[in-house]
Amino acid sequence: MSTPFGLDLGNNNSVLAVARNRGIDIVVNEVSNRSTPSLVGFGQKNRFLGEAGKTKETSNIKNTVGNLKRIVGLDYTHPDFSTESQFFSSKLVELDDKKVGTQVRLAGESKTFSATQLAAMFIGKVKNTVQQETKSNINDICIAVPAWYSEEQRYSIADAAKVAGLNPVRIVNDVTAAAVSYGVFKTDLPEGDAKPRIVAFVDIGHSSYTCSIMAFKKGELKVLGTAYDKHFGGRDFDRAITEHFADEFKSKYKIDIRTNAKAYNRILTAAEKLKKVLSANTQAPFSAESVMDDVDVSSSMTREELEELVKPLLTRVTEPVTKALAQANLTVEDIDFVEIIGGTTRIPTLKNSISEAFNKPLSTTLNQDEAIAKGAAFICAIHSPTLRVRPFKFEDIHPYSVSYSWDKQVEEEESMEVFPAGSTFPSTKLITLQRTGDFQMSAYYTTPEQLPKGTKADIAKWEITGLQVPEGAESVPVKVVLRCDPSGLHTIEEAYTVEDIKVQEVVPLPEDAPEDAEPEFREVTKTVKKDALTIVAHTFALEGKPLNDLIEKENAMFAQDKLVAETEDRKNALEEYIYTLRGKLEEEYAPFASEAEKTKLTGMLAKAEEWLYDEGYDSIKAKYIAKYEELASLGNMIRGRYLAKEEEKRQALRSNQEASKMADLSAKLAAQRKAEAEAKENAKE
């Protein structure tokens, strides 16, 4: 059975959750953290994913890639690229398909990977984390992404999940996932005809800011409006602090960290920590050793200084709030609660700005870091055939209108707006077209000028074939089922011809008709499905050979990572065995080994140690196993004698304890019999 898995794919850190019969649980990673760094690093032998990537980030800065969610599905010529590129220390390149990729060194060779591959590497890592923690199969995943993700980006993240060996049952907007978490676990929501509770969710994470207005009733929610600033987040605060200290250190220490990627990254990491400290304290020290040119730096910052530093950023808080309210056709007075999520909302001055924008106090009833992942896990569980969850209905909304067009074959309209902006999804529409033969259809955004800069207006194209027009007929009616699926992806589910047939239908009897009245029939015309047509889709999704090639490459890299990890484990096991056996041979094992055995084994241990730190320092798994088994062949023999003697001692001790217990019991019984006898004698007297 597959365990439903929810992933909050964060720009800086990601959170994993699983749904089980007893509820929704956060999954801790290999170092017991409840979030995992969203990093992919590359080394001399293998990849460093998640925590391993973070550990090596500073020393491996050119070969470590973060900000994964920002480049998935992004064209190299997209206007956002210039903004995003400043946050990357690895080399970004243009791929053959015009997408953004990265060039790194892996196993001593220059390698180029697409953003989809990088995301797949990380998703594969967290999949493995969940499998290790839950000891269960992981097949299905629900991934939470920003509401501003385009159709192309949603397909790309779904492709990444497939490359990682997962079935993406749903790509959900992250704030919607948090709202599901709110709605499912809140017990005081209005019911029936009562006025719904209107809640504004403000999510400010590492790289973006989303405001969504939701209407809640028990067991359901509806998204009323969503707006965002996709270039406003915690990393902007971190960079503002870093730039402040870069200027200070240039003047104070005569070093320019902007010229050294490693130095800049170290100060950036320290700036993030300083930001968090100042969220709880009014002042904090700031220092780093050997930043560059063997120079140690130190300084400090107060909360007031930080607030002054980020004032230009705070002016951007209001706009998404205003736009979300306008889309929902509401005012701040209509909002019942304002829930804040995302780590950046912990900054006191930012919280004040959000509160002022709504003119309301803020609520933190949700876990700011984990609500999205838990909501995603619950949504994944809804799609599970084996796990029962409480009923909960939710609908998201189309941010932009989507139209479908088709070949003009007869005198009729050539296009139609099918999913207007603000309408809910998932949703299905059925249209009827008069067709004279095979045809094509396209989906596109109705008003491209309203899209974010760089977003492609065209969404998908379909070829619909197999249409047979009867002889003598000019055209035939074709029913086309258009759908916006739960992930917000636009598809054509079905296309088929119809025909009218005449059938006999029972005429309803009058109410006063006798019970034995004979039924009457009438002939009616019904429209029924005739022939299903073939649909070939041309979307942003990877299919066939391109997808299989990426899966094959990922599997090969995963196998290499696994081999390197297992080899390191075997090497460590050999090293530990050498030191442990040498110590025990001098102490507890000493009485159980002959002098000849001691001499031989001591020599073997010395040779193995010398080999391990020389020729065997970078050897293969099989050789470490062979060396271990060579030592164990004699070491285990001596250990067996020691264990046999220890068992003999335990048995002897157990026998003595049992004999002592029997003696004590016999003494107690004798004393009891004596007391009873004395009592009888006393009774006779």
Curated annotation (Swiss-Prot):
Keywords: ATP-binding, Chaperone, Cytoplasm, Nucleotide-binding, Stress response. Residues 651-685 are annotated as: Disordered. Residues 673-685 have a biased composition (Basic and acidic residues). It is found in: Cytoplasm. Pfam families: HSP70. InterPro entries: ATPase_NBD (IPR043129), Heat_shock_70_CS (IPR018181), HSP70_C_sf (IPR029048), HSP70_peptide-bd_sf (IPR029047), Hsp_70_fam (IPR013126). PROSITE patterns: HSP70_2. Belongs to the heat shock protein 70 family. This is Heat shock protein homolog SSE1. It comes from Naumovozyma castellii (Yeast). The gene is SSE1.
